[in-house]
Every structure is written in structure tokens, then in C-alpha cells.
């Protein structure tokens, strides 16, 4: 076992994903998730080597209690691992315009994360809890906490893509612009894709699709991101599990002025009650759509809307890549596993030079990676993401 391990924390609005990784060998010694935080059924699931465990937390446990459980009830029982943790890597969804690369967390970085809360209102507050609790639990590592920003990969986006067509004053005064998200994942799979395609990353033109409960698409020109579908917040873009993605802004005025729905309620509707959940009124889980779209008209409608929006982004982004597209990449829980969705989507892209290989498309899921199109097609690849490994590799640099 290496003497230098990294504890990776991804604190979400109601969950904490955690892992202990050796950045050099890429081995994951511990991984798990505390979920349903602040609810009655809060629990922790984790894996050590090949052994799986699960435990209930106290009812309505918050992030602080969950982190204490992770350290006291999991890591403390693996002291050979605990004593070799030399740094803590934190995934940060939005670092604003000032945080352009991974960095040690100090007061200045903490202020930037706080100032960016309006742009990631569900995520950044949770990240701060994770950081401050890490300071308390690991006082010996207080100067070894590293922020790895989802927005950093998107800092290469030019202003003709990140500016909105609203008065320029709002950007200059309040930094209202496109920030994007999932940058850690987009960066990882773009490099993996360039290796598979045997093209240097600095010459790779790709469209990467991170498709999970949240989802985003990025256009990558010569290895650099030049546009992405998420915007000021993670609400913009494609259809997601509970988020609406792109809509006519006038819907907000109609709901508020005509239907007398408060701004707070509208925010909740767009963030937590829309997307696949809103379209089906049953589930935000894409597995329901995959399993039922051939026999259920509601699921079929949701699938078609999802693929229509996604295909529009892919088609539009191809025009930004200077007449050369090396491939598109699917990642995230949906992108890696939803073979029916991938087939429907790629069939929509036939006009652009894509041709699905049904056998490969069916086989390449459940953690497998590879090309799912025919040899005469522009490649479409499935690549499982590994954000935790990226965070660990970025963090070890500062230890």
C-alpha cells in the first residue's frame, strides 16, 4: 500500500460520496455514499476492498453527523489506511470566475466558494460544510484540503459562448455568465477518448455527454472546452432527472403573475419537480424510462423529449468544431448504461455520419468502455467517468 492516500469528498445537497484512493496506482481502498441526509431514512453504504457494508444513521442526520460517522465508524477501523491519508480533495461545483484551477483551500478560496453560492445554491453550501468539518476532524491536514472545481475545465470557453444576450452591465457588475458544470468528468473522459482513438488530446475534437440525474454536453476543440450546455447554474441545458433544462424565460413571468406562484416555489418546481419527473409524474430515474418506453406512452414521450433536446445540442456543437469531429462520448449513469437511449439518439444523428452497432451498444455498459458505432461511422464511445480519481490526482500535487 502506498504511503500517500487521498480522501476524496463530494458533498451534495443530500448526500456525501467518499473514497480513499492511491493516486499513483489508482487503487480505491474505500468508497461509499451517505444518502438521504436530513431525512428519516438517512444511511451509509460503503465498500472496503471486496466487502460491502451498510448502516442506518440517526434519523434526520445532517452532513456533519454523516462525516463523523464516516471517520469514526469506517476509517477508524482501518487505521492502516487512515494513517496514510495525506490530503483531502473536495469536489466544488462552482468556483466563480476567480477559481480557474485546483488549489489549496484558504480563506480566499472559502470566500470565493461562498460568493458563488447563488450560482450553485444546492451544492456550494454542502461543500462548505464538508470543508469546515474536515478542518475539525483532521486538524493535522488543515493545510492539505484541496478544492477541485467543476467549473475550471470550462474556463477556456470564449466570451461569445459564455456571455448571455442581456445588458453587458450584469456581467461586468455581477459576473452573470455561463459557468458550466461536470467539468471534472468532461475533462477525464475527453482524455480517455483521445487515448482510445489514438489522437493527441491537443488535437482532439470531441463532444462529451455527461448524462446522469444531472446532465450536460460540452464541445471540445483541440482538447479545450469551447462551449457547454449548463449555464449560470446547473439548471440550464438538456432535460435532467428533476431539472427542466432550457425553457422560455417568460414561463417564469406567467407562473408568477398569472398563476400567483411565488419565486421560491417556481425555483423548487424547475429544480426538483421538472425534467423526467415532471414529464412522467412518476419517476426521475432514467431506468424507469429505459424499461418502459416501448410499452408505456408516458415513458416513450419522456424518452423522445430527452433525446430531441440532447440531439439538438450535439448537432449545434458539431458546427463549432472547425469541420472535424473525432467522436462523441457518453458517460455518467445514463450515458454509460442506457443503451436504448443511445440507440435512439445515434439514429437521430445518422445525417451527421453516425451508425449504431446494436450488438456493441448492448454489450458496452455496466462499467465497460468502448466504441458503439460501426467502423464506417464517426465513433461514438462509452467511457465510465472517474471524477474521484481526477480529484485524488489533482490533490496529491499539493501534499
From Swiss-Prot:
Name of the encoding gene: ackA
Family the entry assigns: Belongs to the acetokinase family.
Cellular location(s): Cytoplasm
Residues binding ATP, per UniProt: 17, 210-214, 285-287, 333-337
Catalysis: reaction(s): acetate + ATP = acetyl phosphate + ADP
Domain of life: Bacteria
Protein name, per record: Acetate kinase
Primary localization: cytoplasm
Keywords: ATP-binding, Cytoplasm, Kinase, Magnesium, Metal-binding, Nucleotide-binding, Transferase
EC number(s) stated in the UniProt entry for this protein: 2.7.2.1
Physiological role: Catalyzes the formation of acetyl phosphate from acetate and ATP. Can also catalyze the reverse reaction.
